[in-house]
């Protein structure tokens, strides 16, 4: 629910939302690139877009922002 809320609030693309979910799950950008079969350059571009859209500057800030959203999102499932 938190990722779905972030996706709607910040107009994230499906790829950006998937990256966000992976980061929340503890994956690194390289892990995500390997799992998706894409280049790290692609993931870095998606990360840059995520940071820009959420007005955060670092991956840690992004994860903290979504963690705060988890406090207000419905508690049924954070894996949307």
Question: Where do the PLM segments sit?
Answer:
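Regulatory hinge/linker segments at domain boundaries
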Residues: 1-14
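Short, charged/polar low-complexity linear motifs in solvent-exposed/disordered segments
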Residues: 5-7, 37-39, 79
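Generic anion/oxyanion-binding catalytic loop in active/binding sites
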Residues: 8, 21, 51
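Residue-level marker of positions within ordered structural domains that often coincide
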Residues: 11, 32, 67
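The N-cap/first-turn positions of alpha helices
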Residues: 15-19
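Short helix-to-turn junction characteristic of helix-turn-helix DNA-binding domains
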Residues: 23-27, 66
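Recognition helix of helix-turn-helix DNA-binding domains
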Residues: 26-61
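Basic, Lys/Arg-enriched C-terminal extension of HTH/homeodomain DNA-binding domains
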Residues: 48-80
């Amino acid at each position: 629910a938190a990722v779905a809320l972030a996706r709607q609030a910040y107009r994230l693309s499906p790829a950006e939302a998937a990256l966000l979910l992976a980061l929340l799950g503890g994956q690194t950008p390289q892990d995500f690139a390997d799992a998706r079969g894409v280049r790290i350059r692609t993931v870095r571009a998606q990360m840059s877009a995520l940071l820009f859209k959420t007005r955060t500057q670092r991956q840690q800030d992004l994860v903290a922002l979504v963690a705060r959203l988890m406090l207000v999102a419905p508690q049924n499932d954070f894996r949307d």
